[in-house]
């Protein structure tokens, strides 16, 4: 019908709806309703338009008008940006040119204004068509409302990028107003109705339920905890222990002294290690990984669900696992003194950290000990009680520490970059309310195990690359020159001399920059800026190496319980050599699996960040009005972001500054016009907590004059100076986007901090508490 409508309108130019219905033979009551639905859909897709007189015309593009296709990224203030595949720079879309597009939509745009690199302005575009909507479901609390009697009410969603209300059709069940609903979008905003229309899919819970806030975030991203019945049944059919038949054909390593090293609260112990000195002076390192693929067979219900999830998701108070706990905490957990099926990379490593010989094979092991990071760190620190308790493996642990140092030095020499930044762990009570924020600890034990996992991943990747077989790689491509240039400019603002251009700067030069700022207050901020200049690591069927690790070959082999690519690698280790057809099969399935796994990983990261921001804001609600010392983590036109020692970050907007401030883009500073008070990244300042909003995850601070203030008077204004207080209050562009940065203030808090009577200061003993909590959310750190 659409094609016939277009033909008539092309021929006639303009028609009324009645004339069109008559021409199409759609003037019966039933057919006319069908025609109206089709016309509404075509108008929404900008294929036709209704003129002011009510007639219909085709939406015709202007002659010679070039259109582009991209993804729309909405800002909560109404404007947005369109990213184009293969292009570094985004297109700016003003509020009046959004044309009802919403975040994630695939859109067609025309260029209104080209970019001006001299002025630093982005190209501007207008959205002329929405090719595909990305948002199909929304989660939020129902607000009963009689304003539109046709509907039950509207949804209050945490999604700040949805500016129009979402009205919900009256469902069969009676709503009380406390329900958190998952709804399906039936109609999107248009010229006819500036709101969404949705139908109830499910009742997620109620606003009074414990943990409903986190569940709402997860459900909104379609991250679901419950497994389908068929998956649960398959998991329950898996035995509690391997049989003698299961062990046939495997290398028997049950007599080796192997042990796990994990966080104190970890239950899915999926990796174990052994080490021994060889007669030739080299060390043998064995990395043994639970053979999940033996129980999760290709094409099974377990396998399909694992691929759909592709990764476990770790948020503040829970884990949404890739596989049922029956597997991850049961037969696939390498608990001490029980037989377990594993896949092992056994490597002979010389004094330079080079793998000179290796075996990758299916094995059976029996771990001797279940060690924690804190136990191993204590042993290495000389704790006599712990050394006596674990005397059988003290020598092994010391050899491991020695090997770790060798491997770390080897990676540094070849150019590997270190992106270590402070990471917070939010502690919650039984009601899900945050009670403290501590820093995660990374002692020798944590870094040592990560180092061994990296070595195993590299060895497995190189093995398959040299066999020239279809394989899945974890790749990290070279950064784009434009982003490296931004980092160089940023680093230069600290007085650092940078050698080499953005397109040719070496990893060693980037290492030198980071070494030069070690111990400085802005070191972590600079490390975060370097990380942001990098491309995102992803999975691929093509080997492009790993830039951050300076590795020619890399994959993920060490966590099949929580990452699907690792599960696939284990499957390939077992299946290759069985037949020629198996290589052809893997060649066909790997690209789709790589894309799915990369997308699911990004979704998991987004969920983790959103929950963390929400919980940090909820935590800081208790401290509104309090004053603290903080460190400036980044400076933008509209203000400065500052960070507390527990990683909580907030914005001091220019409207919360006491005078007019000039923004210097070249030096990344804000300077008071009258006082000369100047803010720089890494500088310590005094702040007051003004606002914390759990719903949006935003925290606002204000500036408090103190002895930390730096005054620079009489300095000539840069031609790049931005506007100060008030002038930037309203903005239609990127400058109002909240950005994050990381900094670590190594100074102690001032004793002048105001505290509410009887209230525990949230920064108390941050480091000490972090040491008690081991892996936490935890295995997420092994994701390079």
Predicted stretch roles:
Residues 714-784:
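Intrinsically disordered, Lys/Arg-rich low-complexity segments
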Residues 1-286, 293-339, 370, 377-378, ...:
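Charge-lined substrate channels and their catalytic hotspots, especially those that engage the 3′ end
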Residues 184, 253-259, 264-282, 400-414, ...:
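Phosphate-interacting basic helix/loop segments used at nucleotide- and nucleic-acid interfaces
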Residues 109, 183, 635, 687-689:
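A generic structural signal for residues embedded in beta-strands
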Residues 312-412:
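Conserved catalytic alpha/beta cores of large enzymes that bind or transform nucleotide phosphates
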Residues 86-87, 100, 638-648:
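Basic/aromatic-rich interaction segments and small domains that mediate binding to polyanionic partners
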Residues 360, 373-644, 658, 662:
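Append "with occasional cross-activation on large, charged helical scaffolds in nucleic-acid assemblies
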Residues 105, 125, 653-699, 711-718, ...:
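Intrinsically disordered, low-complexity linker and terminal regions at domain boundaries
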């Amino acid at each position: 019908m659409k094609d016939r409508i277009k033909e008539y309108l092309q021929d006639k130019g303009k028609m009324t709806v009645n004339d069109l219905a008559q021409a199409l033979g759609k003037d019966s009551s039933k057919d006319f309703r069908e025609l109206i639905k089709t016309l509404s859909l075509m108008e929404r897709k900008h294929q036709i338009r209704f003129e002011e007189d009510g007639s219909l015309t085709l939406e015709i593009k202007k002659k010679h008008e070039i259109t582009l296709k991209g993804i729309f990224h909405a800002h909560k203030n109404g404007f947005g940006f369109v990213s184009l595949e293969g292009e570094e720079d985004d297109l700016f879309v003003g509020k009046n040119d959004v044309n009802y597009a919403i975040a994630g939509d695939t859109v067609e745009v025309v260029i209104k204004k080209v970019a001006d690199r001299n002025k630093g302005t982005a190209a501007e575009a207008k959205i002329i068509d929405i090719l595909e909507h990305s948002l199909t479901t929304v989660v939020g609390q129902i607000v009963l409302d009689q304003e539109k009697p046709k509907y039950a009410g509207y949804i209050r969603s945490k999604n700040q990028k949805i500016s129009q209300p979402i009205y919900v059709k009256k469902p069969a069940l009676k709503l009380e107003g406390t329900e958190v609903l998952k709804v399906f979008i039936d109609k999107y905003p248009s010229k006819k109705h500036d709101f969404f229309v949705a139908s109830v899919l499910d009742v997620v819970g109620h606003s009074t339920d414990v943990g409903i806030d986190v569940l709402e975030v997860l459900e909104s991203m379609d991250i679901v905890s419950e497994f389908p019945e068929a998956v649960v049944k398959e998991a329950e059919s898996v035995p509690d222990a391997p049989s003698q038949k299961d062990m046939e054909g495997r290398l028997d390593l049950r007599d080796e002294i192997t042990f796990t090293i994990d966080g104190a609260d970890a239950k899915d112990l999926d990796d174990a290690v052994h080490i021994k000195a060889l007669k030739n002076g080299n060390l043998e390192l064995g990395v043994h990984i639970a053979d999940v693929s033996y129980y999760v067979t290709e094409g099974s219900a377990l396998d399909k669900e694992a691929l759909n999830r592709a990764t476990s998701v770790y948020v503040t108070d829970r884990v949404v696992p890739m596989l049922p706990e029956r597997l991850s905490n049961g037969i696939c957990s390498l608990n001490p003194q029980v037989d377990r099926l594993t896949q092992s990379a056994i490597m002979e490593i010389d004094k330079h950290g080079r793998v000179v010989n290796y075996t990758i094979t299916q094995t059976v092991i029996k771990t001797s000990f279940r060690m924690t990071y804190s136990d191993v760190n204590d042993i290495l620190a000389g704790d006599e009680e712990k050394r006596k308790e674990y005397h059988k493996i003290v020598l092994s642990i010391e050899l491991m520490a020695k090997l770790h140092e060798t491997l770390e030095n080897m990676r540094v020499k070849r150019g590997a970059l270190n992106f270590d930044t402070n990471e917070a762990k939010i502690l919650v009570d039984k009601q899900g309310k945050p009670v403290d924020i501590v820093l995660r600890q990374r002692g020798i034990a944590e870094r040592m195990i990560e180092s061994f996992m990296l070595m195993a991943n590299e060895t497995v990747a190189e093995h398959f690359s040299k066999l020239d077989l279809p394989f899945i790689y974890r790749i990290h491509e070279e950064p784009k020159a434009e982003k490296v240039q931004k980092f160089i400019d940023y680093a230069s603002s600290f007085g650092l001399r940078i050698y080499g251009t953005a397109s040719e700067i070496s990893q060693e030069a980037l290492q030198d920059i980071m070494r030069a700022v070690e111990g400085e207050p802005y070191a972590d901020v600079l490390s975060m800026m370097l990380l942001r200049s990098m491309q995102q690591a992803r999975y691929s069927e093509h080997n492009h190496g790993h830039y951050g690790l300076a590795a020619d070959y890399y994959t993920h082999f060490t966590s099949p319980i929580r990452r699907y690519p690792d599960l696939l690698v284990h499957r390939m280790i077992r299946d290759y050599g069985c037949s020629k057809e198996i290589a052809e099969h893997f060649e066909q399935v790997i690209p789709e699996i790589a894309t799915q796994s990369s997308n699911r990983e990004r979704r998991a990261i987004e969920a983790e960040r959103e929950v963390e921001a929400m919980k940090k804001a909820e935590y800081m609600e208790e401290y509104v009005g309090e004053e603290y010392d903080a460190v400036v983590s980044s400076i933008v036109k509209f203000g400065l972001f500052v960070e507390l020692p527990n990683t909580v970050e907030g914005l001091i907007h220019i409207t919360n500054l006491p005078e007019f401030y000039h923004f210097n883009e070249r030096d990344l500073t804000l300077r008071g016009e009258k006082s000369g008070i100047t803010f720089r990244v890494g500088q310590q300042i005094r702040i007051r907590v003004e606002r914390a909003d759990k719903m949006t995850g935003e925290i606002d601070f204000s500036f408090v004059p103190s002895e930390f203030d730096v005054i620079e008077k009489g300095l000539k204004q840069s031609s790049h100076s931005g506007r100060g207080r008030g002038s930037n209050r309203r903005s239609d562009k990127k400058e109002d986007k909240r950005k994050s940065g990381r900094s670590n203030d190594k100074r102690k808090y001032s004793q002048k901090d105001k505290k509410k009577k009887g209230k525990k200061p949230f920064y108390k003993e941050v480091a000490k508490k972090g040491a008690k909590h081991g892996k936490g959310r935890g295995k997420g750190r092994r994701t390079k």
